[in-house]
Amino acid sequence: MKRFLLIVLTLATLVSLFGCNTSEENSIPNNSIEVSEEESMAELIVPPFTKEEIAAHKELPIWPEGNVPYTMDETVPTVVPYLVENAKGCIMVLPGGGYFQRTDKEEGSMVAEEYNKQGYSAFVVHYRYKPYSGDAILADANRAIQYVRYYSDAFGIDDDKIAVIGFSAGGHLAVMTCQHDSDYKIDDAISKESSFPNACMLLYAVTTLGDGTFMGAGNSSMPEIFLGENKDNKNLIDKYSYYNDINAMPDTFIAYTNKDTFVDFEKNSIALADALEDAGKKVVIKEYTDGTHGLGIGAVYADYSKWFGESITFLGESFK
């Protein structure tokens, strides 16, 4: 990203640069010259973290202290960095958990570490969940992307190569970041960055809050948590379902197992893929035949575990 710095060149500087005569008739007045540069002239941004904190995967608060939206307690939304040198791109990891918990290991740190091995930096997003509802959850996810974009130079990533990956309920949140900017705004430089990802990857994802989303042992409380007292409001159900703004979706990778007994893959994964294809959007969809739900990397499953390598292929094509 290019940032601009106003450089004021004094008379003495110009004389030095151009060897000008300093007599009154040949003097050059002071001028303000706007210069665009990538690095040496970039606006000085002092990040609120150190290299040591990054290396230690310290949680980085994404909201200013005392200005966390929709707050009800002392919960501090954060991102956890997993960085590599010369990153091919950046993955924002949204763990699942039905919005009543967050599976930060199996669908968070373990996923980030695997992408590191393939040359991608990653951030695990510690968004809020129950008792918080969708306003806070989406605000955290949007802000996390903006935060990483704003400090992209310090993180050593390309701010045009940021993908979001979501598992189960985290998949729903991933889709929402592609279609919605948070209604909550604060007046700071970070909030001026785009909150939309450049690519989207979904694993056994919930993509709609409508009827039939869940099956068997599925967590039917998820719409109630996300929408709160408005859980039966059809307008809001539609707003926070994949079909709300299908044309806003970036390149999308969808993977699921046909043994899933929690989330109805036909009404979520397949329905989203069909809508993307109908809209002429790029979509890659993969169906696997083993495992059930909540698998994360799922290395022990011969078929399902192929998703990770296929996601790397997808990223390589999307981040050309």
Q: Where would I find each of the regions flagged by the language model?
A:
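Short beta-strand element of the alpha/beta-hydrolase
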Residues: 88-97
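Catalytic nucleophile-loop/oxyanion-hole region of alpha/beta-hydrolase
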Residues: 103-105, 110-112, 123-159, 299-306
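Short beta-strand/loop motif that positions the catalytic acidic residue
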Residues: 253-260
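C-terminal catalytic histidine-bearing segment of alpha/beta-hydrolase fold enzymes
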Residues: 255, 270-320
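Conserved alpha/beta-hydrolase "acid-adjacent" motif
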Residues: 261-270
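Primarily recognizes the serine-hydrolase "nucleophile elbow" in alpha/beta-hydrolase
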Residues: 143-216, 237
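Mobile cap/lid helix-loop segments that gate and shape the active-site cleft of serine hydrolases
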Residues: 65, 205, 209-244
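N-terminal cap/lid segment of alpha/beta-hydrolase-fold proteins
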Residues: 35-86, 134
